[in-house]
């Protein structure tokens, strides 16, 4: 092999190694910023497709409805705890900060935070439903999937 070919080979190897390193670093950086979307039922029972449940300490977004009667505010701080639910289950949420003006019981919310033991979410951000016609696409899709059940499931057994 002549010297010119060796130099080209070394340059090609260096470029490929640099490209592989760059791709690896970008994927590592993106992995730490990805928040997966779950419903309360998916946190309890796993995603429908894979039955994989989120791990404790995982960052995630959870969408559902604020359970009526569940909002508890600490009178000495901005700490708030509440429960969000869907058709399959409910999870407790703790948040410290100012809640959106549209936040209230029975309203749709998306919380962003970290999963703790006991299916408890330590929220870093709370997003409330904008108006009576707006639903975040992830929440709309999840709620539609949760409510696609036969009418007999929802009938009152006393009737």
Swiss-Prot record:
Localisation per UniProt entry: Cell inner membrane
Pfam family name, one: CcmE
InterPro entries: CcmE, CcmE-like_sf, NA-bd_OB-fold
Region (Disordered): 132-159
Stretches assigned to the Cytoplasmic side: 1-8
GO terms classed as biological process: cytochrome c biosynthetic process; cytochrome complex assembly; heme import across plasma membrane
Organism: Escherichia coli (strain K12)
Bias (Basic and acidic residues) ranges: 132-147
Membrane-related topology note: Single-pass type II membrane protein
A single MF term (Gene Ontology): heme binding
Keyword line: Cell inner membrane, Cell membrane, Cytochrome c-type biogenesis, Heme, Iron, Membrane, Metal-binding, Signal-anchor, Transmembrane, Transmembrane helix
The protein's name: Cytochrome c-type biogenesis protein CcmE
Main subcellular location of this protein, as a coarse class: membrane
Disulfide bonds listed in the record: none
Gene name as annotated: ccmE
Role summary: Heme chaperone required for the biogenesis of c-type cytochromes. Transiently binds heme delivered by CcmC and transfers the heme to apo-cytochromes in a process facilitated by CcmF and CcmH.
PANTHER family in the cross-refs: CYTOCHROME C-TYPE BIOGENESIS PROTEIN CCME HOMOLOG, MITOCHONDRIAL (PTHR34128:SF2)
């Amino acid at each position: 092999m002549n010297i010119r070919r060796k130099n080209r080979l070394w340059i090609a190897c260096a470029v490929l190694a640099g490209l592989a390193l760059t791709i690896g670093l970008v994927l590592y950086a993106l992995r730490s910023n990805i928040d997966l979307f779950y419903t309360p039922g998916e946190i309890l029972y796993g995603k429908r497709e894979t039955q994989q449940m989120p791990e404790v300490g995982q960052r995630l977004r959870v969408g559902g409805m604020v359970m009526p009667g569940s909002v508890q505010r600490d009178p000495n701080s901005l700490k708030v705890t509440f429960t969000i639910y869907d058709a399959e289950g409910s999870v407790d949420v703790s948040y410290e900060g100012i809640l959106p003006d549209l936040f209230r019981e029975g309203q749709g919310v998306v919380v962003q935070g970290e999963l703790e033991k006991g299916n408890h979410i330590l929220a870093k951000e709370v997003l409330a439903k904008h108006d009576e016609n707006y639903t975040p696409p992830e929440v709309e899709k999840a709620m539609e999937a949760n409510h696609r059940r036969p009418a007999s499931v929802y009938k009152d057994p006393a009737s």
